[in-house]
Amino acid sequence: MKKAMPAGRQGFTLIEILISIAIIAVLTAIGIVSYVSINRNARDAKRRGDIEQIRSALELYRSDYGYYPAPASGGLTNLVDTYLPSIPSDPKGDTNPYVYQATNLSATTGQYYGYCLFASVENANLTNTLCDPKPNGYNYGTKNP
């Protein structure tokens, strides 16, 4: 047996429905913005971690050989197998791979005693390039200590 609704109360009003839809829309927008921001920060964290991993491998190479690998003789590929399982790649694909530049070339030995590593980060607040000039499109980097 159905109970009759009290007089004057037939369901939700249009205003109540519109307010509910507006609240849901605002919460959805906040969720989408947070999701995009979290993904961007995660990709940047991976880039910074990759740069640190390459930096560590370069330092191990230098401790074994006394100098850093020359870019013309393979550069970072010299690190694979012995110091790195593989060369890390950018989380968004190979559109902006990591860049290695050997520096401080010795005129007497022909060996490199410095380097710069570059990545392209999405968060403008993380930009840090200790080496200049930096390659076009790259805004984060480090150099040998």
Predicted features, each with a name:
Residues 108-145:
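Short, surface-exposed interaction loops/tails
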Residues 32-52:
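Aliphatic-rich helix starts adjacent to a transmembrane/signal segment
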Residues 5-6, 145:
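Intrinsically disordered, low-complexity repeat segments enriched in small/polar residues
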Residues 2, 8-35:
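N-terminal single-pass transmembrane signal-anchor helix
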Residues 3, 47-48, 63:
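N-terminal export/targeting and maturation segments
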Residues 9, 46, 109-112:
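A generic fold-level signal
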